[in-house]
Design a protein with these regions (language model features):
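Glycine-rich phosphate- or other oxyanion-binding loops that anchor nucleotides, phosphorylated ligands
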Residues: 1-140
Length: 140
């Protein structure tokens, strides 16, 4: 990630932009770009893993419709959607702790997924461990 956003935050009736987190008054929470670069370099070192940096949107529901996916992509400029990363980013931002969200993408979030969830989680865990091992091994 280079940013995270909470796509389900909406205090727009009060005049705020959609996604604004009250109290810290921010929509796009910045991740650690240098760490993201190092993680992508480690993924390239492992091979067979595509690393894409961009904004990740988080919310309180699974996104499984093309309509919702389009709304999140167009409203926030997100390249991926999930349920945890922005909450972690929010806590890190408030406490001045660097972070970077890494996601393994299982489907297109449009209702077309046919991947077996248990097979995907095993592959995602294996790839994540390989990338983190390479990151630590490279000393970058």
């Amino acid at each position: 990630s280079d940013f995270v956003v909470e796509h389900d935050m909406d205090t727009s009736p009060l005049g705020d932009p959609v996604g604004m987190i009250s109290g810290i008054n921010i929509v796009d929470i910045p991740a650690d770009g240098e760490l993201a670069d190092k993680i992508c370099a480690a993924a390239e070192g492992v091979g067979g893993i595509r690393c894409v940096k961009g904004k990740i949107a988080s919310g309180d529901c699974f996104v499984n419709s093309a309509e919702k996916k389009k709304y999140i992509s167009e409203t926030f400029g997100a390249i991926a959607c999930e349920m945890e990363g922005a909450a972690i980013g929010h806590v890190c931002y408030v406490n001045k702790v660097s972070f970077c969200v890494i996601r393994a993408i299982s489907d297109a979030a449009d209702g077309s997924s046919h991947m077996d969830y248990s097979k995907f989680t095993a592959l995602a865990a294996k790839n994540s461990a390989a990338v983190m091992t390479e990151l630590l091994r490279s000393g970058k």
